[in-house]
Amino acid sequence: MLLQRFFTRALHSTRQLYAGSGGSGGLEKSALAALRKKTGYTFANCKKALEKHNNDVGLAEKWLHEQAQTLGWSKATKVADRATAHGLIGVLIRGNRGAMVELNCETDFVARNDTFKRFVDHVACMCLQYTDLTDFDGDLWKLGFDADALRNLRTEEGRTLGDHLALLIGAIGENATIRRALCFKANNDLKLVGYAHPAPTNVGTTEGITQVGKYGAIVAYRSTHPLLDFEFHKSICQQIVGMKPTKIGEYDKDKPAENKDDETCLIHQEYLLDADKTVGEALQEHNCEIVDYHRFECGEHTERSLEAIIRSQHQSSN
């Protein structure tokens, strides 16, 4: 569970927790051990839950989760006004589906915390699963989520991501927000590739591998090359993360910038892995066409909505 310790101190030692009273009210060691293993909560709280529910592990577990949720929402309310200037981008690709999410927190220390990273992965997986509910015509489908829409997404057990966010806040002890997400789904011969930077940490799940970092990119491409060159396609994501192109560009409409350092058109930019060629030349060598892309930078100021950005990129790529 996201909130594995919703009380920070155990009031008794492990020996005291296991010691029964000798009477009918004593705790069974097996029940205490099972509840502790299943929930991850402290021995003190597992003991308290079992005592309240006459050693019924099921009822004790339910009570623990309810207490954790209540404390999480209480903490979330108290810290809601605190700024969340740090955080992570999560990028998850599975087959023809992709999701990129941004979550924010108060400190870089928490952003490096495994609990926070797992929650980034959880949100990315929820967004990826949402794409399964959508059928569409055409080659590429994209959908942006703002903070409100993300918080209202429901998980399989019926809770919202907002509920899970409250649990996270209770666990990490500081404010956190789910800022935005973007889903991709490709049809026909289109493929997706994603990348997070710097030195991405991978969080494994049943949905795939979520990369987390301060920057992220997802690229939709079409390739007629007989062999799929993952490293090359990843390098295009790295190019987009590092050089921040504003559009893909068209050879017959977009002229290269006079100063190559000012180039914002992807196909005319200097290729990061080979300064002697442009990205466009590298793409031609690999029989690859970039159809669409999107870039996230953690904490970046965005005046336009995701929907507006999607529309403008679609128009510029046509």
Curated annotation (Swiss-Prot):
Q: Where is the transit peptide?
A: 1-18
Q: According to its UniProt record, what is one Pfam family this protein matches?
A: EF-Ts_N
Q: Which domain of life is it from?
A: Eukaryota
Report the record's Gene Ontology biological process terms.
mitochondrial translational elongation; regulation of mitochondrial translation
- Keywords for this entry? Elongation factor, Mitochondrion, Protein biosynthesis, Transit peptide
Gene Ontology cellular component terms for the protein in this record: mitochondrion
Q: Which InterPro entries match?
A: EF-Ts_dimer_sf, Transl_elong_EFTs/EF1B, Transl_elong_EFTs/EF1B_dimer, Transl_elong_Ts_CS, UBA-like_sf
Q: Where in the cell is it found?
A: Mitochondrion
| Gene Ontology molecular-function annotations | translation elongation factor activity
Does DNA damage count among this protein's keywords? no
Task: Write out the similarity annotation.
Answer: Belongs to the EF-Ts family.
Protein task: Associates with the EF-Tu.GDP complex and induces the exchange of GDP to GTP. It remains bound to the aminoacyl-tRNA.EF-Tu.GTP complex up to the GTP hydrolysis stage on the ribosome.
Q: What is this protein called?
A: Elongation factor Ts, mitochondrial
Organism expressing this protein natively: Drosophila melanogaster
